[in-house]
Swiss-Prot record:
Ranges annotated as spanning the membrane: none
InterPro entries: 4NH2But_aminotransferase_bac (IPR004632), Aminotrans_3 (IPR005814), Aminotrans_3_PPA_site (IPR049704), Class-III_PLP-dep_AT (IPR050103), PyrdxlP-dep_Trfase (IPR015424), PyrdxlP-dep_Trfase_major (IPR015421), PyrdxlP-dep_Trfase_small (IPR015422)
Name assigned to this protein: 5-aminovalerate aminotransferase DavT
Organism: Pseudomonas aeruginosa (strain ATCC 15692 / DSM 22644 / CIP 104116 / JCM 14847 / LMG 12228 / 1C / PRS 101 / PAO1)
Gene Ontology terms: biological process: gamma-aminobutyric acid catabolic process; L-lysine catabolic process
Matching SUPFAM superfamilies: PLP-dependent transferases
Molecular functions per Gene Ontology: 4-aminobutyrate:2-oxoglutarate transaminase activity; 5-aminovalerate transaminase activity; pyridoxal phosphate binding
Cofactor: pyridoxal 5'-phosphate
Family the entry assigns: Belongs to the class-III pyridoxal-phosphate-dependent aminotransferase family.
Length: 426
């Protein structure tokens, strides 16, 4: 009996908790670069990239070769028991790429949430303080601490009770929705006045470009003001680059373009080229704040994932993927603005590098998010062979996270499909 999407999704429903969501009713069978085929043989252009995990594409040959070579040597020891060179080398290479002219160290773990959890642990240990300030619209993960940091309750933490204490919420700057940079800084000052003194705050954590929140790009001026505020009060600045990192924004880390040096940087997703690896990198004296045994994990920094990540770094250099990311982003934004010129429902085209999004409003009114239309476009695009992702606090944003290795012809085809969807539905 041949497999179908429907039959496998029925099995999924019976076997997998409903809390594990499903964006598209599709079961993937194989993939290559920016193309995915489902179990029924249908072909899709992938503008989702596993949610920013596949900047180097599905199954990049050099990444797969590195993994195969590592599998022939060593699959696991637990780094805390027996060290191995791929972890050490990757820690060195990430430290070279993190902004800052000072000694750095790198912790490797497995998921983005785990990286953020450890960044908070390190910040608290280094400062002797407990408080953390995060922003409205932020997304930092699905573990309890990261849920507390995340600035959206539904669907992430609804019904789960109180989140961990010591977390305070500042306004994220977003001129489109009436929150200026001054408003954001003032909201932090209000926290200092009303909720926690500056000397009780260990860290401020921020995404250089908000991910799930809607791809709002923080300006260079705002990031510099935030850096100055942290320096004034001895607060550590954590840049959550889980989604922005690994070249998505046209530089390896987005903060390179924003004029600031974070104390700690988290990374994950595309660093592993499809393999699970993440980490925290930062000033050596801060990273060393926790005593031996306080950091790590059984699978943290798997030798297989480290081999994949090292190959990803080489691919970025050999194939000039930072430049390619910028070029893909420029063409993408130009194509989206062409669609916008015909359809005023697109209120904004924005992004940094190839981390690009469009935001839709009914009748062009920024007080009326067009969430229903976004949902319809995502469905129609899939029916036409294009995989899209939505996001945003109001569910009215379409984000684009295709591999930066996508061929030009396929990028153009994807844009043409998207234009058709707007012509039919908007």
């Amino acid at each position: 009996m041949s497999k179908t999407n429907e039959s496998l999704l029925k099995r999924r429903q019976a076997a997998v908790p409903r809390g594990v969501g499903q964006i598209h009713p599709v079961v993937a069978e194989r993939a290559e670069n920016s193309t995915v085929w489902d179990v029924e043989g249908r072909e899709y252009i992938d503008f989702a990239g596993g949610i920013a995990v596949l900047n180097t594409g599905h199954l990049h040959p050099k990444v797969i070769a590195a993994v195969q070579e590592q599998l022939g040597k060593l699959s696991h020891t637990c780094f805390q028991v027996l060290a191995y060179e791929p972890y050490i080398e990757l820690a060195e290479e990430i430290a070279k790429r993190v902004p800052g002219d000072f000694p750095k160290k790198t912790l490797l773990v497995t998921s983005g949430s785990e990286a953020v959890e450890n960044a908070v642990k390190i910040a608290r240990a280094a400062t002797g303080r407990a408080g953390v300030i995060a922003f409205t619209g932020a997304y930092h993960g699905r573990t309890m601490m990261t849920l507390g940091l995340t600035g959206k309750v539904v669907p992430y933490s609804a019904g789960m009770g109180l989140m961990p204490g010591g977390i305070f919420r500042a306004l994220a700057p977003c001129e489109l929705h009436g929150v200026s940079e001054d408003d954001s800084i003032a909201s932090i000052e209000r926290i200092f006045k009303n909720d926690a003194q500056p000397q009780d705050i260990a860290a401020i954590i921020i995404e250089p470009v908000q991910g799930e929140g809607g791809f709002y790009v923080n300006s260079k001026s705002f990031m510099q003001r935030l850096r100055a505020l942290c320096d004034q009060h001895g607060i550590l600045l954590i840049a959550d680059e889980v989604q922005t990192g690994a070249g998505r924004t046209g530089t390896f880390f987005a903060t390179e373009q924003l004029g600031i040096v974070p104390d700690l940087t988290t990374f994950a997703k595309s660093v592993g080229g499809g393999f699970p690896i993440s980490g925290v990198a930062g000033k050596a004296e801060i990273m060393d704040a926790i005593a031996p045994g306080g950091l790590g994990g059984t699978y943290a920094g798997s030798p297989i994932a480290c081999a994949a990540a090292l190959a990803v770094l080489k691919v970025f250099e050999e194939e000039k993927l930072l430049e390619r990311s910028q070029a893909v982003g420029e063409r993408l934004k130009a194509g989206l603005r062409e669609i916008q010129a015909k359809h005023k429902v697109i209120g904004d085209v924005r992004g940094l590098g190839s981390m690009v999004a469009i935001e839709l409003f009914e009748g062009g009114d920024t007080h009326k998010p067009a969430a229903e239309l976004v949902s319809k476009i995502v469905v129609r695009a899939r029916e036409k062979g294009l995989i899209l992702l939505s996001c945003g606090t109001y569910y009215n944003v379409i984000r684009f996270l295709m591999p930066v290795t996508i061929p030009d012809a396929q990028l153009e085809k994807g844009l043409a499909i998207l234009a058709e969807c707007f012509d039919e539905l908007a």
